[in-house]
A protein has these predicted regions:
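Conserved alpha/beta-domain cores
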Residues: 1-198, 204-206, 218
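Gly/Pro- and small hydrophobic-enriched strand-loop and loop-to-helix capping segments
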Residues: 208-223
Length: 223
């Protein structure tokens, strides 16, 4: 078995106050999650609703599950009973469906709006202009069973650290704009989710509050 405990502490021990670790457990077996759980990790990220559902039913109930992948509206109902946060909301349609399914379970689901800043067509998310438009039009204000907690983005998949830093800085600056204009009175709009195994140290420099780390903790994925 991969030495999950040692790797987890290597990552966590280097994190400054105010930065949370989301341990990305997709495609990893339950025993790896349990090993991290036994070392105190409580927040895990998954990107497939069926895998998440199966894990949530068998693993400890105090785990905080984050959905980090592209989520189709018709799949929200499968994770609505127990998801803590949906990190990649990229359409108003999805936001409304999360609200609808959360209401059925009499709960409020936290979400992050996903930005598409990376120079790759394969990434999902709002452009900065489209995100402004969504917030300006205000339909989201009527949704009482979702709470927008911040922004999320994935930087370009590149070795160019300056490009990564540029994209994350842009996201951080846009967060400040959105916070001041739309969420100034909401202390819970505070999350900036960027940074993965390969670039989380840059992300921390760029004011990330949540890093998504899988490979550095659990090793290569087990498909």
């Amino acid at each position: 078995m991969y030495d999950v405990a040692t790797n987890l502490h290597k990552v966590k021990d280097g994190l400054p106050d105010g930065v949370r670790l989301i341990a990305i457990s997709k495609f990893h077996p339950n025993e790896y999650i349990e090993a991290a759980y036994n070392e105190g990790q409580r927040v895990f990220g998954e990107s497939h609703e069926q895998e998440l559902s199966a894990k949530a039913k068998t693993l400890p109930t105090d785990i905080e599950w984050h959905f980090i992948g592209h989520l189709q509206s018709n799949k929200v109902k499968y994770i609505a009973p127990y998801i803590s946060m949906i990190e990649a909301v990229d359409t108003l349609k999805l936001l409304k469906e999360i609200n609808k399914q959360a209401a059925k379970h009499n709960r409020i689901i936290n979400v992050l709006l996903e930005l598409h800043i990376a120079e790759e067509d394969s990434k999902y998310g709002f452009s900065i202009d489209d995100c402004r438009k969504l917030l300006e039009e205000g339909d989201w204000c009527e949704l009482k069973n979702v709470h927008i907690s911040g922004l999320m983005m994935m930087a370009s998949n590149t070795d160019d650290t300056e490009q990564i830093r540029k994209e994350m800085t842009l996201a951080a600056n846009f967060f400040d704009e959105v916070k001041a204009k739309y969420f100034a009175d909401d202390p819970e709009f505070k999350e900036r989710s960027w940074g993965m195994s390969s670039d989380y140290e840059i992300a921390i420099d760029c004011r990330s509050t949540m890093i998504r780390v899988g490979t550095a903790i659990f090793g290569p994925r087990v498909y």
